[in-house]
């Protein structure tokens, strides 16, 4: 029998404050060389942002966050990234360099 995990509510504070980032791919290559899609979903409004990229690394994710989230909606206080956990520290370092 499979163990059932307990659900935990996510506290919400203000609009565009908490984002979740996921990576879609490896997809068929596009004419521009893109093979992945970075997708961000805001927890409260469920607003979505997405961008096709050629590779997934700390630079591409931090550029996506800076250009598509921070410039449009302001700084967030919470960021949830599942698959690319090895990039989290470098992503945050790159974002803080931009400020």
Where does each model-flagged region fall?
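Retroviral integrase
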Residues: 1-99
């Amino acid at each position: 029998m499979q163990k059932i995990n307990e659900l935990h509510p996510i506290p919400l504070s203000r609009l565009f404050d908490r984002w979740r980032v996921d990576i879609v791919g490896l997809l068929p290559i596009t004419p521009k060389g893109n093979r992945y899609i970075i997708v961000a979903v805001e927890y409260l409004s469920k607003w979505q942002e997405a961008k096709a990229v050629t590779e997934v690394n700390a630079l591409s994710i931090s550029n996506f966050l800076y250009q598509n989230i921070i410039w449009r909606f302001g700084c967030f206080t919470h960021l949830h990234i599942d698959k690319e956990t090895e990039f989290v520290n470098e992503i945050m370092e790159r974002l803080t360099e931009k400020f």
